[in-house]
Regions:
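Short beta-strand elements in bilobed, periplasmic/extracellular small-molecule ligand-binding domains
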Residues: 1-4
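Flexible loop/turn connectors
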Residues: 7-109
Length: 109
């Protein structure tokens, strides 16, 4: 990444919540929403992905999906090894379970 950002713009009609592609984007979205007068999670829920440090420095702290990085790496290495050894490779999608880490940016109703 080169450190540049595509500016976030808020929609006219706000959804009940946002699911962001990473915690850094979720952090920036929370800041923008708060500046616009929204309360997180009372008005709008926000979740991130990757359970990065941004999830805990954000106020309120972000609910995030914790990725099993070791599991993803092991799955990739195993598929690559099978392919390099001429063995059959399963379907191109491999599911690696993760965990939802519930924090303050969402409300369980």
């Amino acid at each position: 990444a080169d450190g540049s950002w595509i500016p976030l713009s808020l929609p006219r009609e706000m959804p009940d919540g946002f699911v962001c592609n990473c915690d850094e984007v979720a952090f920036n979205l929370v800041e923008k929403l708060k500046k616009a007068g929204y309360r997180i999670p009372q008005d709008i829920a926000v979740t991130g992905y990757d359970d990065h440090r941004f999830s805990t420095i954000c106020t309120p702290q972000l609910t995030s999906y914790r990725v099993d990085v070791d599991g993803m790496a092991n799955a990739a290495v195993n598929l690559l090894a099978r392919k390099l050894n001429g063995k059959a490779v399963p379907a191109p999608i491999t599911l690696v379970p993760g965990t939802i880490v519930y924090r303050e940016s969402t409300q369980v109703k």
